[in-house]
């Protein structure tokens, strides 16, 4: 089990993040009852004080709400993300602990360059690319790192 071994999400972190990303308290305009249920769901799903990315996605799916709403509640509660499906927020971002490939597959590289040139290199677009190419998000993220491309627009609002 992965331990969320990071410090608490504090006011300094919140200020830094909000200078880059403005989600607002309720970006999906959810009714107060739904927000209360969402807060409870996030609290109940915490693993060692953090919310695993796939669990955040599942909460959104189960509640039929946008993923960004889960991220906004996480910010409000001061909860950090763990287990990002693209490998962000880890020291070792490669899925291969011993010998990481030094070049991206031509198909993944072409897809990433196409997204980058269209200014659409986002988390959602990367997941669509993984479905289209029948690969994993980590492989696509690793290829982006190899190519020096930056993925943005986290569906939970983390980056």
Model-derived segments and their meaning:
Residues 2-159:
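Long, charge-rich, low-complexity intrinsically disordered regions
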């Amino acid at each position: 089990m992965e331990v969320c071994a990071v410090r608490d999400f504090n006011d300094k972190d919140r200020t830094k993040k909000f200078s880059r990303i403005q989600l607002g308290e309720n970006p999906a305009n959810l009714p107060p009852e739904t927000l209360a249920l969402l807060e409870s769901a996030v609290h109940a799903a915490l693993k060692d004080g953090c919310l695993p990315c796939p669990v955040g996605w599942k909460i959104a799916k189960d509640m039929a709400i946008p993923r960004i709403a889960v991220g906004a509640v996480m910010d409000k509660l001061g909860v950090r993300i763990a287990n990002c499906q693209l490998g962000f927020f880890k020291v070792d971002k490669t899925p291969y602990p011993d010998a990481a490939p030094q070049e991206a597959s031509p198909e993944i590289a072409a897809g990433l360059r196409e997204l980058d040139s269209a200014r659409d290199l986002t988390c959602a677009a990367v997941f669509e690319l993984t479905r289209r190419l029948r690969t994993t998000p980590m492989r696509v993220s690793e290829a982006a790192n190899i190519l020096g491309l930056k993925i943005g627009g986290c569906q939970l609002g983390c980056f």
